[in-house]
Amino acid sequence: MKWLCSVGVAVSLALQPALAEDLFGNHPLTPEARDAFVTDLLKKMTVDEKIGQLRLISVGPDNPKEAIREMIKDGQVGAIFNTVTRQDIRKMQDQVMELSRLKIPLFFAYDVVHGQRTVFPISLGLASSFNLDAVKTVGRVSAYEAADDGLNMTWAPMVDVSRDPRWGRASEGFGEDTYLTATMGKTMVEAMQGKSPADRYSVMTSVKHFAAYGAVEGGKEYNTVDMSPQRLFNDYMPPYKAGLDAGSGAVMVALNSLNGTPATSDSWLLKDVLRDQWGFKGITVSDHGAIKELIKHGTASDPEDAVRVALKSGINMSMSDEYYSKYLPGLVKSGKVTMAELDDAARHVLNVKYDMGLFNDPYSHLGPKDSDPADTNAESRLHRKEAREVARESLVLLKNRLDTLPLKKSGTIAVVGPLADSKRDVMGSWSAAGVADQSVTVLTGIKSAVGDNAKVVYAKGANVTDDKDIVTFLNQYEEAVKVDARTPKEMLDEAVNAAKQSHVVVAVVGEAQGMAHEASSRTDITIPQSQRDLIAALKATGKPLVLVLMNGRPLALVKEDQQADAILETWFAGTEGGNAIADVLFGDYNPSGKLPMSFPRSVGQIPVYYSHLNTGRPYNADKPNKYTSRYFDEANGPLYPFGYGLSYTTFKVSDVKMSAPTLKRDGKVTASVEVTNSGKREGATVIQMYVQDVTASMSRPVKQLRGFEKVNLKPGETRTVSFPIDVNALKFWNQQMKYDAEPGKFNVFIGVDSARVNKAEFELQ
């Protein structure tokens, strides 16, 4: 794989503008050398130059270049985001070297969340793989392509635990589970940063959004978060800490308030927890325009007050506003912000630039000018093989009645639906520098898979939505939803005619990518009515109906589950999505994905998640009782539980065996099962291990994921899968906010999803 190759690019500094001899050199990338270097550099800087380092601005095609040139000349910019080509980045770094007094390099950042030019499945899809090797692949390829474009940092990974699918940004995260999110976030940081973010094909990560952004009330974007410290530290904080412990150089601070205090002005969060308790040494970055929003939050009286509060609370870099540059000079002059506080913020920024290797070579991620690609979007710059492999693993088979899947590569296949041939939507939101024309749609993938062996007929069938208000809202800044010029009846009739002449119908339905994005919260998480009408009409033809879902959140699918013969959850699968989906539909790849979020039966169940507390009156489906924790108009559990996903083969999991009945605090026990492929096809499944603290000083979840392993087995093959358990897997923040494990009985559950498990037990001494 080209991204694993050791590419020795000798950067000829002779081709770049002259560098300051006393600033640039072969500096050791050690904390001691960095601290001495930055201390000396700070002594040479004016107040305005220090403030300039704290400013992070967006530079896109619409920005006035001359104004930016003057800001760079005057040292008023510390970093730039949203510039994504080597040529454009080089111009601005050249301006620093040619025009500014101290020649302090800029760093360049972008939202490389699930790929740069090659777009991988959205993070929720990647989480469905339950495969850390897939995460590593996405991280390394994304970093390679980002660095190859001249970028130094990415605003990723997003590790906000979310249990509310109404929230549009659930698509960016790894789901509802703390352990899974922490494990995947940690792995992504390690993969993207490599041995060092200074390496030619690595980038520095920025864990986001600190903190608890995924818990906004009602799933409504930018809303408030209010929760107990126990819930915060047990369920929401571990993924951030895991990413920082893995070495992430930056943290993006959330836009929400937490227990009444905006995260942007929360010194307890940014200093007491982040710096003092966790020992974080990198930079904190405000989210877009967050400092000025403190006024609307009601925690700052005016712009100057907002800047004072933000800086003193621990915000190092201000993203996309002019508040720091406008108001910090006066605040420092008046003494309302001390020079020590300004120096501390500037030091953090200079530290990460040092760690990026920019003071050794400000062009380290650019190379010599004559190496710039002639075509930034050249096909040769993509990593299609890796994208297809990862996309396959992200797909989750939700239903397969009477072995409807895999399909035969013969006969006539109707491919219908508003998302079946959408190059933009298959990429998902936050698709970075990906080019829609380079993505493979489901229709294209199916045609490629069957070749001349089958006839494929296509009909759009419906718009994603016919709700004019929703279309207007989603298309406010860009065309996120396309509306066909034909009437709904004309499109529906075309789809029905296509279905009637076919042996099987594949309907690609769900959400446009813009419906599962920032500022895209929903109160209704069913498939839009226009598409529900299409599904009903297709069902009425009597032809076998396969639903291919394309969406960025769990959807309420009770009706569709009744109508469809098979359902394949594909999320937004990326550049190679169409080929990967076709691989699964026709059996060239046996699906192995598992759900990282529970699928509710209706929006009224939200939040529904597997690791809930038992309550004093738990509902028992075998012995239903009115006076238990339940709804009277809806079944209690989700439609599809966390960890769920089918295969084209079957698996048998044995009883759980414990290596010992007791666990000492300085030891470990091992829980093991025998897993057998009891079907007729080779396939993989994810064996999941959950733990329950039966009796504790405070109520604990009914089960919590503490390990998983994907195993591939041939028909009849059996393998032992073992999970070590130590005291760290049992610790929690108790009522006194002490992090510890309490002696007593623990249950261990192992199975193929969170509902179908076998149980054993042990005791912690």
For each predicted feature, which ranges?
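Gram-negative bacterial Sec-dependent N-terminal signal peptides
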Residues: M1-L19
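Short glycine/proline-enriched turn or capping motifs at secondary-structure junctions
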Residues: W3, A755-N758
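Glycoside hydrolase catalytic-domain context in secreted enzymes
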Residues: A20-N734, D740-S754, E761-E763
